[in-house]
Design a protein with these regions (language model features):
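Short alpha-helix in the alpha/beta-hydrolase fold that links the catalytic acid
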Residues: 196, 211-219
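Conserved acidic catalytic loop of the alpha/beta-hydrolase fold
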Residues: 64-81
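Catalytic active-site module of serine/aspartate enzymes centered on a nucleophile-bearing elbow/loop
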Residues: 225-257
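Acidic catalytic loop of the alpha/beta-hydrolase fold
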Residues: 205-209
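Conserved alpha/beta-hydrolase catalytic His-Asp/Glu region
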Residues: 118-122, 134-192
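Flexible "cap/lid" loop of the alpha/beta hydrolase fold
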Residues: 94-99, 104-135
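Conserved HGGG/HGGXW glycine-rich cap/lid loop of the alpha/beta-hydrolase fold
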Residues: 8-58
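Short beta-strand/loop motif that positions the catalytic acidic residue
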Residues: 194, 200-202
Length: 257
């Protein structure tokens, strides 16, 4: 078992667990904690090789990242939790809900996919090659530029600088490992197995990570699932429009089955 950095906030009885994406760490969810801490116990953690979590060499898989989450929940004796994940974190959350339905109270995959496709894979193969040849610093700026809308980038340079620092906390092993997992993503045919109450959330201006039309299609494969789009937000919707995202988040999580 790897050493995993995690943080618990809040004083409520029900758990909600946030799952990060590629080159993110648990600080990406800082803007969501105040909206939930009165009513929920909030668990955030770093994927292996990201932030403060231990890295291992070699390719990772989505199944391995699901096992990491299961091990953490077991260690903390969290029997059931709602899951919120963004990007690769959304894929991990979907996979966890498929493999461990008894542990998931509600599911909110954000700005994500359930299957890798050739054109998207080509972009990630190019990013991996750049990192291998030039190091992680070479993809920091292209990543920041891809994650947010032009309007947001112009108005919030201080947020972009925080994001750059977050990306730089990712290890080379962690980046290569989780991108390999992402390239192997193939969950779409199993989405009908999801039993948890599910809300798919996209950023209205997300063109690549989890475009609204793609996420609407995913929601149609899960019994009873819905899709909503956060206005004025691109890929990292929870940071670009925290008010809009948090309204959807709190409305969804506070409803019980």
């Amino acid at each position: 078992m790897i050493r995993t950095r995690y943080r618990i906030d809040g004083s409520g009885a029900r758990w909600v667990t946030f799952v990060t994406g590629i080159a993110n760490d648990l600080t990406m969810w800082d803007g969501q904690v105040p909206a939930l801490e009165r009513d929920f116990r909030i668990l955030r953690y770093d994927l292996r090789g990201h932030g403060g979590s231990e890295a291992m060499r070699g390719d990772y898989s989505v199944s391995l990242l699901v096992e990491d989450l299961l091990a953490l929940l077991n260690q903390l004796r969290v029997q059931t939790t709602s899951l919120v994940g963004l990007g690769l974190g959304g894929a991990i959350a979907q996979a966890f809900a498929i493999e461990h339905p008894e542990r998931v109270e509600a599911l909110m995959p954000c700005c994500c996919r359930a299957r890798m496709v050739p054109d998207f894979a080509a972009m990630w193969q190019k990013l991996r090659a750049t990192v291998q040849q030039e190091g992680l610093e070479a993809i920091v700026e292209p990543t920041v530029q891809r994650w947010f809308s032009e309007e947001f980038k112009a108005a919030h340079p201080e947020v972009l600088e925080k994001i750059r620092k977050m990306i730089r906390r990712t290890t080379l092993e962690g980046y290569m490992g989780v991108t390999a997992a992402f390239l192997g993503l193939d969950l779409e045919d199993r989405l009908p197995e999801i039993r948890a109450r599910t809300l798919y959330v996209s950023g209205a201006e997300d063109k690549l990570g989890g475009p609204p039309e793609l996420m609407k299609g995913l929601s149609e494969k899960v019994n009873g699932a819905k899709h909503v789009s956060v206005p004025k937000a691109a890929h990292i919707a929870n940071i670009q429009n925290p008010e809009g995202f948090n309204q959807l988040l709190t409305d969804f999580l506070r409803r019980k089955q």
